[in-house]
Amino acid sequence: MIMHTPIMMTTLISLTLPIFATLTNPYKKRSYPDYVKTTVMYAFITSLPSTTLFILSNQETTIWSWHWMTTQTLDLTLS
């Protein structure tokens, strides 16, 4: 799980670049939709290693249940 954090942060930082591009406008030659498309593509590509590790480590099949609260007739669990 420790390896997922830097890859996820890289993905999120690359997704914030179009927001900052509207403030500074560094690319006057390229249109904004092309810049956003390229940034989202790079963010998707950088998120693939962590997604692959997540799937290969069988974490998506982990089931957990949290017993939250019990009253007289109601049993609340979060699953």
Swiss-Prot record:
GO molecular function: NADH dehydrogenase (ubiquinone) activity
Protein EC: 7.1.1.2
Compartments reported by the entry: Mitochondrion inner membrane
TM region(s), chain numbering: 5-27, 40-57
Keywords of the record: Electron transport, Membrane, Mitochondrion, Mitochondrion inner membrane, NAD, Respiratory chain, Translocase, Transmembrane, Transmembrane helix, Transport, Ubiquinone
Membrane topology: Multi-pass membrane protein
Keyword field contains Electron transport: yes
GO cellular component, one term: mitochondrial inner membrane
Single GO BP term: mitochondrial respiratory chain complex I assembly
Substrates-to-products reaction catalysed: a ubiquinone + NADH + 5 H(+)(in) = a ubiquinol + NAD(+) + 4 H(+)(out)
Disulfide bond residue pairs: none
Keyword Membrane applies: yes
Family: Belongs to the complex I subunit 5 family.
Function: Core subunit of the mitochondrial membrane respiratory chain NADH dehydrogenase (Complex I) which catalyzes electron transfer from NADH through the respiratory chain, using ubiquinone as an electron acceptor. Essential for the catalytic activity and assembly of complex I.
Subunit structure: Core subunit of respiratory chain NADH dehydrogenase (Complex I) which is composed of 45 different subunits.
Protein name (record): NADH-ubiquinone oxidoreductase chain 5
Organism: Macaca fascicularis (Crab-eating macaque)
Gene name in the database record: MT-ND5
